[in-house]
Swiss-Prot record:
Residues 27-44 have a biased composition (Low complexity). The lineage of its organism: Eukaryota, Viridiplantae, Streptophyta, Embryophyta, Tracheophyta. This is CMP-sialic acid transporter 2. Residues 1-24 have a biased composition (Basic and acidic residues). GO terms for biological process: transmembrane transport. GO terms for molecular function: pyrimidine nucleotide-sugar transmembrane transporter activity; transmembrane transporter activity. Residues 1-52, 104-125, 173-175, 233-239, 299-314 are cytoplasmic. Expressed in roots, leaves and stalks. Keywords: Golgi apparatus, Membrane, Sugar transport, Transmembrane, Transmembrane helix, Transport. Residues 74-82, 147-149, 197-211, 261-277, 336-356 are lumenal. It comes from Oryza sativa subsp. japonica (Rice). It is a multi-pass membrane protein. The gene is CSTLP2. SUPFAM superfamilies: Multidrug resistance efflux transporter EmrE. It comes from the Eukaryota.
């Protein structure tokens, strides 16, 4: 009996000690839980910002080297390869990269409703429109150099900045503030000023075909970009690689039709990869990675960010050209760079405030 009383007293002492310590422990536990949630939220926000930054930087770097690779892929002033097969190769490579990314997702997360390839007709039926628009725009990108030189092309390319802003307002019904509209105008002025040099006078002598192609490219680029963003963001939880896969599948189909219509005999007689060089392969790889980067910018940022990325890339191209081609950067370039920097800042701080 005495032994039992001793054991009961020991048990009581242990329980009492736990009761004394438990309020502090519960407080510490609660604080730890709150801290963990705050850390998780901050980590998620940091990761999101990091992803946006990486994708935007990648798009800027890829776009800045795009024009250089297109020019380098020429031989004796012309393309010895078929531009339709090059476009098809770009779409095929993008499709392959999307499948590889999906395969890794399936291995790590399993197949879910949001990352499975199977889809409904309603979902997939919207992809042919941007696919055919991108195909035409990409083909025009090669042919416009028959009518304009590189500086003139860079200046005319700024037309898509305005078309994107207008279509962004019309299609996505998203309001742009007066400051943002002013930023668009400044951006056009800045990019144009930065590209001015003695040869830029040729832009006034550009044949009507060159002007028409530049305007059509601007409209196609703006409409396809905004329309694609609307599709991608319509179902935010949908895996971006699944959305890309279906867009690129239709891109392959339309480019295959273009090959049959335009270069069928040449491909049959000389081969699909006739005239390809190492620079051509680099150009195709660049276009493929650029396309994926654009879609990720649309998914995790917006099409306006894409426009500013490509605009900054134009200035980067000019800087790189100093080392590659010995180009001289005039005062106009530095003035234009300053104006572009100001426009980027105005666009960032001029976003419409949500109504309370």
């Amino acid at each position: 009996m005495e032994y039992r009383r001793v054991k009961d007293q020991e048990s009581y002492d242990v329980v009492s000690q736990k009761d004394i310590e438990s309020p502090g422990e519960r407080s510490l536990s609660s604080t730890s839980a709150t801290s963990s949630l705050s850390t998780a939220g901050a980590s998620k926000g940091k990761n999101s910002w990091k992803l946006k930054s990486i994708v935007t930087l990648a798009l800027t770097l890829l776009t800045s080297s795009q024009a250089i690779l297109i020019v380098w892929s020429k031989r004796a002033g012309k393309y010895e390869y078929s531009v339709t097969t090059a476009n098809f190769s770009v779409e095929a490579l993008k499709c392959l990269l999307s499948l590889i990314a999906l395969y890794r997702t399936w291995n790590s997360q399993g197949v879910t409703e949001d990352n499975r390839l199977s889809t409904s007709f309603d979902e997939v039926s919207v992809y042919p429109i941007p696919a055919i628009l991108y195909m035409v725009k990409n083909l025009l990108q090669y042919y416009i150099f028959a009518y304009v030189d590189a500086p003139a092309y860079q200046i005319l390319k700024n037309l898509n900045i305005i078309s994107t802003g207008v279509l962004y307002r019309i299609i996505l019904k998203k309001k742009l503030s007066e400051i943002q509209w002013a930023a668009f105008i400044l951006l056009c002025a800045g990019c144009t000023t930065a590209q001015l040099n003695p040869s830029s006078d040729h832009v006034l002598q550009t044949p009507i075909q060159g002007w028409v192609m530049a305007i059509v490219m601007a409209l196609l680029s703006g409409f396809a970009g905004v329309y694609t963003e609307a599709i991608i963001k319509k179902r935010p939880s949908r895996n971006i690689n699944v959305q890309n896969f279906w867009l690129y599948i239709f891109g392959m189909l339309f480019n295959l039709v273009a090959i049959c219509v335009q270069d069928f005999d040449a491909v049959m007689n000389k081969g699909f990869f006739h005239g390809y060089s190492f620079i051509t392969v680099l150009m195709i790889l660049n276009h493929a990675l650029s396309g994926i980067a654009v879609s990720m910018v649309m998914k995790y940022a917006d099409n306006i960010v894409k426009v500013y990325s490509t605009s900054v890339a134009m200035l980067l191209t000019a800087v790189v050209s100093v080392f590659l081609f010995g180009f001289h950067l005039s005062l106009a370039f530095f003035l234009g760079s300053t104006v572009v920097s100001v426009s980027v800042y105005l666009h960032s701080v001029g976003k419409p405030q949500p109504q309370k």
